[in-house]
UniProtKB/Swiss-Prot annotation:
UniProt cross-references to NCBIfam families, sorted A to Z: rRNA maturation RNase YbeY (TIGR00043)
Gene Ontology CC terms: cytoplasm
Native source species: Limosilactobacillus fermentum (strain NBRC 3956 / LMG 18251) (Lactobacillus fermentum)
GO biological process, one term: rRNA processing
Cofactor: Zn(2+)
Subcellular location: Cytoplasm
Molecular function via GO: metalloendopeptidase activity; RNA endonuclease activity; zinc ion binding
Name used for this protein in its record: Endoribonuclease YbeY
Broad class of enzyme this protein falls into: hydrolase
SUPFAM superfamilies assigned to the protein according to its UniProt record, in alphabetical order: Metalloproteases ('zincins'), catalytic domain
Family matches, as PROSITE patterns: UPF0054
Cofactor binding note from Swiss-Prot or TrEMBL: Binds 1 zinc ion.
Keyword field contains ATP-binding: no
Function of the molecule: Single strand-specific metallo-endoribonuclease involved in late-stage 70S ribosome quality control and in maturation of the 3' terminus of the 16S rRNA.
């Protein structure tokens, strides 16, 4: 999977956090059997930027921890021949994570910033791949998978 990583944190993002992001997303992609030609972006921001995105796209005027913008819509590709679809990159979408919220929530929840970052990465990635937690059965499925991936990264609760 191709990952485009952007850092809008004015120096707050640590190299170890970038490495964790790459590792967590690669492991999640492998677990979900995401095609190698899949593409996504990950942008790390500060609270003011994610607050603006949250307000503009979700109508909620406060900072949040992660926002997922899924791009791929299978309906758009359904009319193309299978051999052409197989050659096209799979556009998963964009994740935006507030590095400020990673720190705040890790302190509040009394666990490591790595655990919090891993959680947000995997949670957002699952949303990009069609998982949600609107219904109890879907929530159980998503959260179980999420914890299994985090356990595999050594980021257990």
């Amino acid at each position: 999977m191709e990952l485009q990583l952007r850092d809008h944190t004015e120096g707050k993002l640590q190299p170890s956090q970038e490495r964790l992001a790459e590792k967590a997303l690669a492991q999640a992609a492998e677990r979900l059997d995401v095609p190698e030609q899949a593409e996504m972006s990950l942008t790390f921001v500060l609270n003011p930027e994610i607050r603006e995105l949250n307000r503009d796209y979700r109508g909620i005027d406060r900072a949040t921890d992660v926002i997922s913008f899924a791009i791929e819509d299978d309906d758009d590709l359904a009319n193309l021949p299978a051999e052409i679809r197989a050659e096209l990159p799979v556009e998963l979408g964009d994740l935006v994570i507030s590095i400020d919220k990673v720190t705040e929530q890790a302190l509040f929840l009394n666990h490591s910033a790595d655990r919090e970052l891993g959680y947000l990465l995997v949670h957002g990635f699952l949303h990009l791949n069609g998982y949600d937690h609107e219904e109890p059965a879907d929530e159980e499925k998503m959260f179980t998978l999420q914890e299994e991936i985090l356990d595999g990264l050594g980021l257990s609760r």
